[in-house]
Amino acid sequence: MVREKITVSTRTLEWKCVELRTDSKRLYYGRFILSPLMKGQADTIGIAMRRALLGEIEGTCITRVKSEKVAHEYSTIAGIQESVHEILMNLKEIVFRSNLYGTCDASICVRGPGYVTAQDIVLPPYVEIVDNTQHIARLMEPINLCIRLEIERNRGYLIKTPQNFQDGSYPIDAVFMPIRNANYSIHSYGNGNEKQEILFLEIWTNGSLTPKEALHQASRNLIDLFIPFLHMEEQNSHLENNQHTVPLAPFFFHDKLDKLRKNKKEIALKSIFIDQSELPPRIYNCLKRSNIYTLLDLLNNSQENLMKIEHFHIEDVKEILGILEKQLVIFLPKK
């Protein structure tokens, strides 16, 4: 085994990329180091970063397939080499790169004989395929294969259940995670009480994003989780009267929204959807999952209601207010 010489900073804490490679269209690898760290810090950061990489980054997958000619998932179609189940498993493996919010539709319509691959999928412009050569099916005879697909951007897993089945529609167990694996190791250096640590972080992705992009997204997600702690009032930071909560710094969302609500009659808020606003993807997805689709829906929610949304923070509420004020000015009729 050849020892690798790596130069690390002895003063300023910094990330450094020491290796990047593309093993295939669907397998990227990156290795990074963070140093110098005090004893124990590397393990803290390594655990948090690995969990954020594997659980917090969104990916895009096919989640449902519909075809009128299919009797059930385990049937076969005359003239096609693969069974319906095998075709579904092949579609499950297709890797997408997208700026998709929520779900969208796609389709395949080809005529045999010949091979059906990922490049035969007709997609909206904001979704693209990472590897066009991925195999889907082989048509042995001059027959038509037409299927409709539902594509979704999400995080984690989506396991199909009996309630998910619809007529002629077959859900697919989706693995949205674009990170194939993430590992970290810790190396110590120095003597005595001056021992320091280097954190090595390895990231494998499915090709829909690079290891550098994955590291950036995971870091951003972790920062978002800790932002509320930075806005606590210093004078209220200790627990008083046996209270077990620490109040956030006051942000008078309601007062500002009242001024905006006065303009309701002048603006068709019902017809202005939140995807027309300049909302960041994470905020948009959080609102949509809470059935907030229009600016009217948004204005009818209090700060307290918004803060109850999963993964929502006070900074998100402030950002929404800024965008709302800008948006309402844009849509106000000129006098």
From Swiss-Prot:
Subcellular location(s) of the protein: Plastid, Chloroplast
This protein's UniProt keywords: Chloroplast, DNA-directed RNA polymerase, Nucleotidyltransferase, Plastid, Transcription, Transferase
CC per GO annotation: chloroplast; DNA-directed RNA polymerase complex; mitochondrion
Broad class of where this protein is predominantly found: plastid
Recorded family membership: Belongs to the RNA polymerase alpha chain family.
Gene Ontology terms for molecular function: DNA binding; DNA-directed RNA polymerase activity; protein dimerization activity
Function of the molecule: DNA-dependent RNA polymerase catalyzes the transcription of DNA into RNA using the four ribonucleoside triphosphates as substrates.
Catalytic activity of the protein: RNA(n) + a ribonucleoside 5'-triphosphate = RNA(n+1) + diphosphate
KW Lipid metabolism (keyword) present: no
Signal peptide boundaries: none
Superkingdom of origin: Eukaryota
Top EC class of this enzyme: transferase
Alpha N-terminal domain (alpha-NTD): annotated span: 1-233
CDD domains assigned: RNAP_alpha_NTD
EC number in record: 2.7.7.6
InterPro entries: DNA-dir_RNA_pol_insert, DNA-dir_RNA_pol_RpoA/D/Rpb3, DNA-dir_RpoA, RBP11-like, RNAP_asu_C, RNApol_insert_sf
Record comment regarding domains: The N-terminal domain is essential for RNAP assembly and basal transcription, whereas the C-terminal domain is involved in interaction with transcriptional regulators and with upstream promoter elements.
Protein's name in the database: DNA-directed RNA polymerase subunit alpha
Region spans: Alpha C-terminal domain (alpha-CTD): 265-335
SUPFAM superfamilies linked: C-terminal domain of RNA polymerase alpha subunit, Insert subdomain of RNA polymerase alpha subunit, RBP11-like subunits of RNA polymerase
Quaternary structure, from the entry: In plastids the minimal PEP RNA polymerase catalytic core is composed of four subunits: alpha, beta, beta', and beta''. When a (nuclear-encoded) sigma factor is associated with the core the holoenzyme is formed, which can initiate transcription.
GO BP annotations listed: DNA-templated transcription
